[in-house]
A protein has these predicted regions:
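Conserved AdoMet/S-adenosylmethionine-binding subsite of the radical SAM
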Residues: 1-119, 126
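Auxiliary Fe-S-binding modules of radical SAM enzymes
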Residues: 69, 86-206
Length: 206
């Protein structure tokens, strides 16, 4: 509130969903929930702590609830592509977008010195298929992306990057126009918010 910047929170799901209301009232603009894998096998094998203490369903409950409170496109579900079969990743995309959230897809990269250092990197063709599927579902379900200004990350492929894979048809054109209209509509809000933050910071400095 003092800076005017947008606030995004990456959280583990909780049983008491009303706790998210408190965060929204405090000024949270975005929620992100990382459940990583769709298949029970991969989720249990690679995320044993989450599987044991939380379970997958808790992540979807949290996404559905917070998306219902904030609106479409302001909640994300994070998944890792390239470890489990892409059919499972596509199921995850369906579940996330059914919640009104957008998928944040991290492509698996084997890191030297890690437990999965020798695990093979995913094929480009399969990852392209995954991102094409993601943008198709976002277009189909009219989940807006890229509305907030100046959001740049290097670790993941942003949903907006997948627009290059979308079909050049009327649905895509309408979706692009929809996102553009929303961006224009909320731009004054973001500008006012940042200006208020600038004034507060100047007052504190003086």
């Amino acid at each position: 509130q003092k800076t005017g910047l947008l606030v995004g929170l990456q959280l583990a799901p909780v049983d008491d969903l009303t706790q998210y209301d408190e965060l929204i009232d405090a000024g949270a603009d975005h929620f992100s929930f990382c459940f990583e894998f769709m298949s029970d096998f991969a989720f249990s094998k690679y995320c044993p702590g989450k599987a044991r203490t939380l379970g997958q369903s808790a992540f979807f409950r949290a996404m559905e609830y917070t998306s219902g409170k904030l609106g479409k496109g302001r909640v994300s579900g994070e998944i890792i592509a390239g470890v489990e079969p892409i059919e499972e990743t596509m199921k995850a995309i369906d579940r996330i977008t059914d919640c009104g959230a957008f998928p944040t897809i991290c492509v698996f990269r084997p890191l030297e010195g890690s437990d999965m250092a020798v695990y093979p990197s995913p094929f480009y063709e399969e990852m392209r298929e995954v991102f094409k599927y993601m943008i198709d579902r976002l277009i189909e379900k009219r989940i807006p992306i890229g509305i907030a200004p100046n959001v740049e990350v290097s670790l993941v492929v942003q949903p907006t990057d997948a627009l290059y894979l979308a079909d050049n048809d009327m649905n895509t054109l309408l979706y692009r126009a929809y996102n553009k209209a929303l961006t224009s509509l909320v731009k004054p809000f973001f500008n006012r918010r940042l200006k208020r933050g600038d004034r507060r910071m100047e007052q504190r400095a003086s």
